[in-house]
């Protein structure tokens, strides 16, 4: 199936929108193929503020309606305790929230940006979207992440080369409880790295007061050259800060 055929079938839909590459392309495709669609962004403690800002700007650039739903994800004990099933519980809670909001707006179909490159074994959240009946047109149409980036580039949309960015909870090892303070410290630490000019990195939590900073190969040497400045800028958020000498793998 091609996307034009999908949207010939699905004339109106709610779109779970994160502002990332995949859901941005899905929103663009809905606009291009004249689907009566509305984007829904769920703001929890897991999403940094810049992601909301970028999502709002992108939706506005397409002149597509966007609803922002605020949600206390840490109110769910099974999520806050950060078990290996956290992603499943989180995705389930967020999608149920979107379904409820979409229904109030008259939408019965919810779409998300899962693509053909996503590995179901590595993404517990895919189980939740399957259970809830969310449709994933990019995956149904066989579009890979590489193809999606190429199509966004061809459409001259700057999001085409946006680095992959997972939620703040992924910085914390399973079994370490999640709190607003800990997640806020991670966000502030990563904002400090953005301010220093870095764009593809992770501030991993080793303990409540220790962070391990990981950079992709093209940025690691610069980070090591600036190590003293980096440690100084992040020390307000973590007592101990280290830079991983091994480059992190760049995600597609």
What residues fall within each predicted segment?
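ATP-dependent adenylation/nucleotidyltransferase module used to activate substrates
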Residues: 1-154, 195, 211, 228-238, ...
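Alpha-helix N-cap and loop-to-helix initiation/capping positions
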Residues: 86, 178-181, 222-226
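Short, structured loop/turn "capping" segments at alpha-beta junctions
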Residues: 144-145, 149-150, 157-166, 199-200
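Internal, active-site/partner-interface "lid" segment
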Residues: 162-182
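Short amphipathic alpha-helix segments
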Residues: 180-201
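C-terminal boundary motif of the adenylate-forming
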Residues: 197-206, 244
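A short interface-forming secondary-structure element
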Residues: 207-225
